[in-house]
Amino acid sequence: MKKEFASPRKLLSVLLIFFLVSSLALAGCSSKNSSAETKTKDGKTKYTMWTFVQVHADYWKDAAETWNKNHPKQQIELKINVLPFDQMNQKLQVALNSGNGGPDIADVEIGQFAKYTKSNNPPFKDMTKEVEPFVPNLVKSRTDNYTVDGKIYGLDYHVGTTLVYYNMDIMNKAGIDPATIKTWDDYINAGKVVKEKTGKYMTSAETSAGFVFTSMVAQQKSDLVKDGKSNLSAPENVKALQTIQSMLKTGIAKTAEGGHQDNEEYYAAFNKGEYASVVMPAWYMSRMVGFMPKLKGKIQITGLPIFKEGDLRSAGLGGTATVVTNQAHDTALAKKFVVESKAGKEGSIKTWTILGFDPIRSDVWTSDELAAPNKFTDYFGTDIFKQMAAFKDEVGGLSVTNNSYPIINDEFLTNGLPKIMKKQANVEDTLKALDAAADKRIAAGK
């Protein structure tokens, strides 16, 4: 039965959007870029940037200072606004749809990117020409994520190289060297030994996020999308979920606290030594340093186990692109600034030294700067990137920015993963049903 009255929450959302549109329209009416508005008194070009992460703001503050030092004749003044994730996404979408009130530069989380590129005219500036000189040194899967019809519209902060983080206190007690774990079968067998000898779980199974699943999919060179339709029931994807489900059935894994591995409840459990390992991207190092102090000096990282010969040993997961919007002024300068800050050698190194991320330029992974002492090398040792460099050309990716991906991912996380992991539903049957449901939504544009 249809509800006759909108809920208070829905009314509040409508009012919020109305006020956002009104305020942005008013801002647009009064701010058509005059020289007084785009230049400071001393001649610097003024830009605004929106982001949803404070440390990203710290990075861009440094980037602007570095740019001004290196380009005395092209000085800029960067005003950075940090907003909560949902608020920023909603505000940015309204601004770009209305054509007024948006920033010159913005961060767009990878899962949101496809929302902006559905049309033939995305609201971002094409950076292909500016990025091209750097392409030989960039991890391809990272530029592919933000490429639409051959045009590059954004650059990421990191690769998101997926790793296995082993708690060596537990692994040593079980008598297992992670270097001997080559395949997922090896991993499961090692987990049985860990459980038997230490009573600890080998790992966890997510019920509300797909970090482990999607890394397994990408390493097999599969995808969740094929020709714009749902590809969830592909054999490789079925195998990935059956493998995770089997870890629960054999008792070497339990469902993750909070439903996934990137929340404070889970950090506390891992910090207490409840798990021998966790599969997460390289940016998870910052979570360990910040939330798992007891494990300092006790973590060993490796690439992913494989299913079969020819599989990749990692996947690039997560991400946030920095874009230049179509409301920017002096877009040529804005693009040069963003690209040099992200893809240039100095800027790429700073994604590690400031943010603790694995740079999108793989040629800097073995540089002295990335081995220099900091809070990350104190925690993990100085050979982090030497280890990752061994599989830098084996980082798979998914079609996350495909227009169909958000619908498919939503179906999977909402109607599939919880059933498979919590209720032990049949993997293949569930994924086939999800394909049908997702394709119906894709066809309807929902």
Segment roles from a protein language model:
Residues 1-48, 69, 429-432, 436-446:
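Short, low-complexity disordered leader/linker segments with a strong preference
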Residues 109-161, 172, 185-189, 196-198, ...:
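Hinge/lid segment of periplasmic solute-binding proteins
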Residues 114-116, 284-295, 308-411, 444:
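C-terminal lobe and pocket-closing loops
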Residues 70-138, 173-175, 182, 269, ...:
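Extracytoplasmic "Venus flytrap"/periplasmic binding protein-like
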Residues 54-76, 117, 413:
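Short, polar/charged alpha-helical segment
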